[in-house]
């Protein structure tokens, strides 16, 4: 069977840059699934994506599906015919489904009985006939949140479509895709190369598009070229380009023929906090800032043009003229904001609603101020500085700079606080209160910042849960999942002595009578413990290890983490599996007994050598391990408890627990309860698989 290269290119108007990669990857995944489901043999499925096109190139695509033999077993002969030998309705229905009559069916006979049988040789359908529907189906399944309609057509797609190229080898596959008749026509760059040309063979793609159309269709190639050229451009001016992955991806999705150029701005703008300048360059203009080796921002930026110009200086000058007013605005806002103290913005917070039922940003500020001070006292941070940071925490939201450049909230509070002469840890806390903003983000760097960051997040959690608006499904408008995980990360990774129980109770108390959910404290804690589950799963811990610790519901995050590490280590011990099984057995025995047990084991009632030995070791370990539990040395405790494997195994081998003698039975149950309690001081080991 011969094989050919298949090409599909959808020529469109400019596609959404932030969605370009996902559209292309989904197109490739969908089409690969179509090929596999159809049983079509194929080689590599390569995707291409540029601002005005999505394309796939499939190597070694078979010309047809393989022929196949099919067998369909019908009703048993006893049910297929009536007493007169006439076909039953069941038999006739089965035959119609196979496209035959009952008398055309074969018989299948085995030692288990006899049935009607349909056998057929099915010839594989040609690839050419299958491709149009496969392409259309793959496009219809793309993750497009909002479809467009254009012209008088009822066709919907992410952007208007102008060309559809379908080539199997050198042959055009006739089809109408997204309202466009397929052809071998491809459009090139808007301003360079040939605006439109024909492609003779699928194998010519994407090289022909580069040569004749001046378009680099390979997304990864464009991205790599931009990165390499930008690094070289920065090196030439003695700096390092800020090539963040997200911006690099976006710029690669905006250009078809990337040309990297270097421009500059006036040095006077460097007096403005670099974060505001960078926000303008990266967020608004899609420029790459350049830093000196000491980390200071240079008065230069790198940008990517979508054209090779005979006069690149004209393009450079144009971009410099575009960015200058934005930088001038930042300079003006910075100078204007500093004419008054940060604290002077407090009254204006009363005019901004935090949440309708929970009050204004000023109300939130007062709660954060009190909660940050309370947290600071618990963790040994400067209480005065923490309350001061809480008071100023939202003031920068009222500044001109943050109003215009919203992503500078926090960092501008830090700069304005420094200008006002606030303590350095207070200023830093204003910037770091929102950390961690995402997975892997840095944590607050000092105790005051930790107190403020936790206070801000806990106030939001308590408030939103307190009015019954907890996250449902994928919806989380107040980013409560991120807030909860942020609190847990700070407490665990900074090893802070905080208890979620008292922390949540204090956050709830500060709301007064505004909250309507009577179970808010438990709801918040359960939600946060649920975040622990997701966190530790991401860290590679097994689900049953997490469940074993969650079963004890430890509300001190640092303590929770210590238990997780202890149980994970315990699982590596030789005795772990046997003791987990024994704990499960003990748990089941105790659950089935409704008898009232004693507080302690009666040594005089012990009878068998195995129970005497086990009881003695339980008593010894109980006394020995008490300091371990008090100090949170759970790993050491479980290592010691692992020594119980032999006496526990011997006990269950030789001793019957549920004997008729009530005194003996209760004493043995009590001993098992004391044994289980030792393990439960760490986790429910019986849940380990």
From Swiss-Prot:
Instruction: Enumerate the PROSITE patterns for this protein.
Output: AA_TRNA_LIGASE_II_GLYAB
Q: Pfam families of this UniProt entry?
A: DALR_1, tRNA_synt_2f
What's its EC?
6.1.1.14
Sorted keywords for this record are:
Aminoacyl-tRNA synthetase, ATP-binding, Cytoplasm, Ligase, Nucleotide-binding, Protein biosynthesis
Enzyme kind, highest EC tier: ligase
Q: Does the keyword Aminoacyl-tRNA synthetase apply?
A: yes
Q: Note whether S-adenosyl-L-methionine occurs among the keywords.
A: no
Provide the protein's localization: Cytoplasm
The UniProt catalytic activity note for this protein reads:
tRNA(Gly) + glycine + ATP = glycyl-tRNA(Gly) + AMP + diphosphate
- Gene Ontology cellular-component annotations: cytosol
**Which superkingdom?**
Bacteria
For this entry, list what GO says about its biological process: arginyl-tRNA aminoacylation; glycyl-tRNA aminoacylation
Could you tell me one molecular function GO term of this UniProt entry?
arginine-tRNA ligase activity
Q: Which family does it belong to?
A: Belongs to the class-II aminoacyl-tRNA synthetase family.
Q: How does it assemble?
A: Tetramer of two alpha and two beta subunits.
Sorted alphabetically, which HAMAP family does this protein's record hold? Gly_tRNA_synth_beta
Know the name of this protein? Glycine--tRNA ligase beta subunit
Query: According to the entry, what is the taxonomic lineage of the organism?
Result: Bacteria, Pseudomonadati, Pseudomonadota, Gammaproteobacteria, Enterobacterales
């Amino acid at each position: 069977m011969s094989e050919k290269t298949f090409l599909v290119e959808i020529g469109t108007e400019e596609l959404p840059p932030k969605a370009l990669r996902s559209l292309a990857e989904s197109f490739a995944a969908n089409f690969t699934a179509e090929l596999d489901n159809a049983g079509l043999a194929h080689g590599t499925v390569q995707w291409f994506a540029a601002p005005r096109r999505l394309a796939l190139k499939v190597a070694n695509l078979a010309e047809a599906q393989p022929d196949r033999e099919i067998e369909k077993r019908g009703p048993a002969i006893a049910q297929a015919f009536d007493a007169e030998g006439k076909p039953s309705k069941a038999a006739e229905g089965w035959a119609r489904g196979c496209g035959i009559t009952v008398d055309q069916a074969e018989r299948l006979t085995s030692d288990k009985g006899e049935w009607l049988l349909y056998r057929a040789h099915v010839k594989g359908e040609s690839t050419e006939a299958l491709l149009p529907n496969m392409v259309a189906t793959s496009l219809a399944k793309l993750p497009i949140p909002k479809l467009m309609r254009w012209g008088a057509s009822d066709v919907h797609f992410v952007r208007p479509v102008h060309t559809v190229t379908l080539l199997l080898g050198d042959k055009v596959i006739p089809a109408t895709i997204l309202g466009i008749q397929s052809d071998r026509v491809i459009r090139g760059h808007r301003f360079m190369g040939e605006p439109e040309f024909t492609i003779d063979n699928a194998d010519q793609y994407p090289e022909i598009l580069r040569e004749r159309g001046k378009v680099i269709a390979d997304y990864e190639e464009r991205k790599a070229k931009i990165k390499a050229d930008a690094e070289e451009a920065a090196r030439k001016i003695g700096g390092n380009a800020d090539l963040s992955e997200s911006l690099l991806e976006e710029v690669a999705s905006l250009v078809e023929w990337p040309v990297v150029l270097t421009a500059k701005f006036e040095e006077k703008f460097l007096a403005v906090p670099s974060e505001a300048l960078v926000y303008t360059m990266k967020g608004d203009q899609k420029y790459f800032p350049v830093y000196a080796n000491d980390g200071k921002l240079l008065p230069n930026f790198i940008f990517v043009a979508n054209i090779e110009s005979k006069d690149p200086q004209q393009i450079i000058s144009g971009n410099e003229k575009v960015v200058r007013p934005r930088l001038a605005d930042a300079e003006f806002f910075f100078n204007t904001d500093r004419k008054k103290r940060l604290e002077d913005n407090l009254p204006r917070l009363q005019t901004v609603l935090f949440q309708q039922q929970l009050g204004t940003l000023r109300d939130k500020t007062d709660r954060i101020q009190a909660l940050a001070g309370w947290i600071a006292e618990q963790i040994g941070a400067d209480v005065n500085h923490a309350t001061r940071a809480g008071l100023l925490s939202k003031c920068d939201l009222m500044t001109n700079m943050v109003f215009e450049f919203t992503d500078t909230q926090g960092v501008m509070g830090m700069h304005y606080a420094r200008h006002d002469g606030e303590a350095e840890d207070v200023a830093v806390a204003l910037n770091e209160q929102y950390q961690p903003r995402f997975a892997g983000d840095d944590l607050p760097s000092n105790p005051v910042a930790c107190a403020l960051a936790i206070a801000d997040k806990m106030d939001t959690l308590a408030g939103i849960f307190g009015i019954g608006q907890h996250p449902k499904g994928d919806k989380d408008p107040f980013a409560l999942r991120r807030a909860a995980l942020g609190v847990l990360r700070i407490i665990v990774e900074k090893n802070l002595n905080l208890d979620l129980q008292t922390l949540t109770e204090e956050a709830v108390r500060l709301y007064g009578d505004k909250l309507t959910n009577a179970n808010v404290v438990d709801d918040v804690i359960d939600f946060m413990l649920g975040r622990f589950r997701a966190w530790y799963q991401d860290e590679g811990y097994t689900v049953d290890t997490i469940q074993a610790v969650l079963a004890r519901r430890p509300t001190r995050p640092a303590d929770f983490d210590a238990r997780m590490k202890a149980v994970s280590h315990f699982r590596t011990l030789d005795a772990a599996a046997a003791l987990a099984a024994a704990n499960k057995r003990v748990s089941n025995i105790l659950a089935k007994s409704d008898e009232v047990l004693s507080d302690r084991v009666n040594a005089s009632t012990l009878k068998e050598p195995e129970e005497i030995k086990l009881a003695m070791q339980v008593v010894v370990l109980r006394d020995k391990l008490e300091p371990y539990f008090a100090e949170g040395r759970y790993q050491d405790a479980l290592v010691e408890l692992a020594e119980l494997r032999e006496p526990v195994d011997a006990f269950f081998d030789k001793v019957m627990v549920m004997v008729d003698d009530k005194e003996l039975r209760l004493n043995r149950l009590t001993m098992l309860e004391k044994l289980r309690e030792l393990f439960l001081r760490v986790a429910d080991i019986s849940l380990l698989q």
